[in-house]
Regions:
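Iron-sulfur cluster-binding electron-transfer modules in prokaryotic oxidoreductases
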Residues: 1-129
């Protein structure tokens, strides 16, 4: 909900479908058919929004949309972005109150593996000044 509030404050309209799963947990457990079924459901549910960005919070799930879906043959969601990737590219009307303090950043392993940390650093820089 907090991420939705930030996106709305930036001037973006947000649609958050419920009950969708990327299938990543099934894929990790070797249940490819179940993963493919969940992925197809997600692609079908998001089809009316083709061309719009799909913004996600969880790196493992989000990278499944970008990388695993095409490999499973269920479609492609190439416009899928992590929340911080989207904000780094589309800050919209957001005005950050500058904070002057030290922060320790520990990135998600998938963010590191897929070189997604620069977006986190950029958004933190918008806040930290």
């Amino acid at each position: 909900r907090a991420a939705m509030k930030v996106l709305e404050a930036a001037g973006h309209r947000v649609y958050a479908p419920r009950g969708l799963c990327c299938g990543r947990t099934f894929l990790s457990a070797g249940m490819v058919d179940k993963a493919r079924k969940e992925a197809r459901k997600m692609v079908q549910a998001l089809a009316p929004f083709a061309g719009k960005p799909v913004v996600g919070l969880e790196p493992s799930c989000l990278f499944s949309l970008r990388d695993e879906f095409p490999a499973m043959g269920v479609g492609e969601l190439s416009g899928a972005l992590l929340f911080e990737e989207f904000l780094a590219r589309n800050p919209g009307k957001l005005e950050f109150r500058q904070m002057k303090q030290d922060v320790l950043l520990h990135g998600h392993c998938h963010q590191k593996a897929f070189d997604a940390m620069p977006a986190v650093e950029k958004v933190l820089g918008m806040v930290m000044g």
